């Protein structure tokens, strides 16, 4: 009702970003150690958070879901992302989860374990295939001066 009366469109421009670091802590896969009543509550919580992330994007909220182990994150949260940035993943299950979510072939998925420091696989849902990208070293002094921090 507020949006209808205020003239805000259903697909607002990005206004805010929330970073979910170590996302597996709140977006655990539904099958991991969840049995009985507690499991139902935990699974429902993950479902509600994933749904909220999907809905809040419409209102200009962006989410960055970060985890060193994509296999420890609920697959619905991974599917719900548009851009995936994958750096070296030594664990096979993590490579498969991230690689399949990025439209990679099995031979490409194996190569994720061999990526050098600073090289990432980048994929967006409307791309035909993922690309390799060199990521520059983080320079916090440059960032601080750019944003007057």
Question: What label would you give each PLM region?
Answer:
Residues 1-111, 137:
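Conserved P-loop NTPase motor cores
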Residues 112-116:
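C-terminal lobe/lid and adjacent interdomain/linker elements of RecA-like ASCE P-loop ATPase modules
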Residues 118-149:
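Conserved P-loop NTPase motor module
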């Amino acid at each position: 009702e507020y949006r209808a009366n205020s003239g805000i469109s259903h697909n607002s421009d990005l206004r805010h970003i929330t970073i979910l670091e170590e996302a597996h802590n709140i977006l655990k896969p539904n099958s991991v150690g969840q049995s009985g009543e507690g499991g139902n509550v935990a699974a429902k919580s993950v479902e509600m958070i994933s749904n909220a992330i999907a809905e809040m994007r419409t209102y200009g909220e962006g989410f960055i879901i970060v985890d060193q182990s994509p296999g420890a994150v609920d697959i619905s949260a991974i599917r719900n992302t548009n851009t995936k940035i994958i750096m070296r993943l030594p664990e096979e299950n993590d490579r498969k989860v991230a690689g399949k979510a990025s439209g990679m072939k099995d031979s490409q998925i194996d190569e994720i374990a061999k990526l050098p420091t600073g090289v990432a696989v980048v994929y967006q849902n409307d791309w035909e295939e993922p690309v390799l990208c060199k990521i520059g070293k983080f320079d916090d002094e440059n960032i601080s001066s750019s944003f007057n921090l």
